């Protein structure tokens, strides 16, 4: 909770000294929705801190316990949780929450392996891209545009995070073959493509349900 409060206060202090205070009211609202997400922009300071703390804790739990191994394939729900985090608390706070979640999860069950910072970076970028796309593009109340934005999130995070960051990093460190051969092996033989499909399917299924839970007052369009 203390970390979440510190992060929130840092942004507030930065805003007071920056261009935010020279914006029109409408632009201020759009800026708040982009940075804090549409959900947090409509809530008070205490609610903002609570949401950030809860989602950071969820990221930690996802990295500690939501990982499953079947033969040579490792499944996890971190992509889904990271995307949900970025959408609900915004791209910047989402990035920080997901990066911290990966770090704490590693410390919990490192089992003697070295820390791989690119994994935390990729999860942070999943939240960053998801937050920007879902909160930055106005859906104008059109349900079909909501799903178009989700599809863009899935494609971009797959290409940027799974392929460009994680696969490239593992290839540089461990692979003895060409990049494209390793990419095919990692996606299909090691099952990373199916891990992505499961996480993205969960995003399409659960996000619309979460947005309809009235007590949470989550704004996604």
Annotate each PLM feature:
Residues 3-8, 12-221:
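Loop-helix junctions at membrane interfaces
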């Amino acid at each position: 909770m203390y970390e979440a409060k510190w992060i929130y206060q840092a942004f507030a202090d930065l805003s007071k000294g920056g261009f935010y205070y020279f914006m029109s009211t409408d632009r201020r609202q759009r800026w708040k929705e982009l940075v804090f997400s549409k959900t947090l922009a409509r809530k008070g300071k205490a609610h903002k801190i609570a949401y950030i703390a809860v989602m950071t804790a969820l990221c930690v739990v996802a990295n500690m316990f939501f990982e499953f191994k079947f033969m040579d394939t490792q499944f996890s729900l971190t992509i889904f949780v990271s995307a949900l985090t970025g959408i609900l608390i915004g791209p910047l706070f989402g990035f920080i929450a997901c990066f911290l979640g990966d770090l704490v999860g590693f410390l919990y069950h490192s089992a003697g392996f070295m820390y791989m910072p690119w994994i935390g970076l990729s999860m942070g970028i999943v939240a960053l891209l998801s937050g920007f796309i879902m909160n930055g593009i106005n859906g104008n109340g059109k349900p079909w545009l909501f799903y178009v934005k989700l599809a863009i999130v899935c494609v971009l995070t797959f290409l940027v995070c799974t392929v460009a960051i994680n696969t490239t990093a593992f290839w540089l460190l461990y692979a003895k073959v060409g990049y494209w051969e390793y990419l095919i092996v990692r996606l299909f033989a090691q099952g990373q493509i199916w891990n992505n499909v499961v996480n993205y399917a969960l995003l399409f299924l659960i996000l619309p349900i979460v947005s309809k839970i009235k007590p949470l007052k989550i704004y996604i369009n």
